[in-house]
Amino acid sequence: MTPRGPDAAGVWSQGRVALGHRRLRIIDLSEAGAQPMVDSDLGLAVCWNGCIYNYKQLRRELGELGYRFFSHSDTEVLLKAYHQWGDRFVDRLYGMFAFAIVERDSGRVLLGRDRLGIKPLYLTESASRIRFASSLPALLAGGDVDTRIDPVALHHYLSFHSVVPPPRTILRGVTKVPPASLVAIEPDGRTTTTTYWEPDFTRRHDRADWSERDWEDAVLEALRVAVDRRLVADVPVGCLLSGGVDSSLIVGLLAEAGQHGLATFSIGFESVGGVKGDEFKYSDIIAERFETDHHQIRIGTDPMLPALDGAIGAMSEPMVSHDCVAFYLLSQEVAKHVKVVQSGQGADEVFAGYHWYPPMGEPAAASVEGSVASYRQAFFDRDSAGVGELVTPAYLLDGDPSGQFVTEHFARAGAATGVDRALRLDTTVMLVDDPAAKERGLFRPEALDRLLADPNGRLTPLRGNELWQIALLELWLQRHDITGAAA
């Protein structure tokens, strides 16, 4: 259970509650920012993973209210904000986070996850205890978990490019806290889950007559705000630079914000069959233009297969992506230079750049029923009958739970067009970032607050092979010592 941060470790317990933490020092590198953090005056303890981008503003506001601080960390701001504003303190947070706050006197525990679910939080319950962790394998390491495959989760996994929507996971005995959710665990063991935020995809009438230039200006300003908010680390921050529009824009905005000598990183592979394996000529142009400290990382074919086990082991949940191993190797190399990097990923999720969005804009997708049909045809890996052909009778289900899930989501108010319904579903459910990089605590999603979601590369590594998802699931189960066939 060692992974997560490599810089420090801490344990705290009181009564029936215990917290453990491994730290990656990003803000306030001193021991004053260590976790679990206890504020004896307030009677609170916290253990969390993430970064609060507006913690300095909140710290000033809390200081004006009379609070005194013993550290310079965002962790302490989290504690005092909870003390001042209660559960709804999360409304004031801009950032990515998964936290557990314990009240000393009452024994109440509050768990919370950020709006877009950038930081994961898993739960497992038994008759006598509730355990939570930032990774699913951490719960498995503690034992006493029902590791049978959840048939409904398996149906989603085989329909949605290996995504299992919360609160389910692929295992029956483990759930995940949904994005923008709070879970209150009362002293008597009762639990209550509430959603504290939902994105609104309703078209704004006051922007109906905006020109393209108006939208360009608004997007650029929002990007500037997003980049500025993320410049809070007390360690050097780098940037992934592919040479494409998205990452090049981020590098330019970081330079505009005053970042000099920015470390940038580009990845390249061996050329195969006359096809060039890198785009260094494009990234070099941007690196030279903004005078970055540029690193070209070349990855040959030899380390790819040996790294497969490590990449799968780093996944909190089985995740099929054509670039998982590459990003795992990239994170190892980048971590030799910096602890945090920005990236330009996320634009396709905001501006509907994926291939399944154009059909959602057609007249046939205007109604909820039409939207479901178009989304199913463009996005689903296979229909329910196709899922049934892959699994054993023990996992066959009546009906179509994946189709029903999408139908119910599309039918909710707040998104009037097919594109908006798909964007809302993708932003809040379908899009998760690369698990291997996330496990290393390296990548900081460079996304517009409340708009951009984490990226998800979903191209199958075994094109044309109906068993690619099953194979990955089997490898993940074996890697985490879960016995029994997946299907």
Stretches with model-predicted labels:
Residues M1-M315, F327, P393, A471-R479, ...:
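Cysteine-centered catalytic environments shared across enzyme families
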Residues G15-R16, E64, L140-G142, D146, ...:
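Adenosyl-5′-phosphate
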Residues R16, L29-S30, A45-V46, Y94-I101, ...:
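Conserved adenosine/adenylate-binding substructure
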Residues E76, V152, E221, K281, ...:
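A structural signal for well-ordered alpha-helical segments within the folded catalytic domains
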Residues G86, H161, S316-P318, L451-L462:
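Short loop/turn hinge sites at secondary-structure boundaries
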Residues A347, W356, L477:
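Flexible, active-site-proximal loop/turn residues at the rims of small-molecule/cofactor binding pockets
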Residues F351-Q377:
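A mobile, often basic/glycine-rich helix-loop segment
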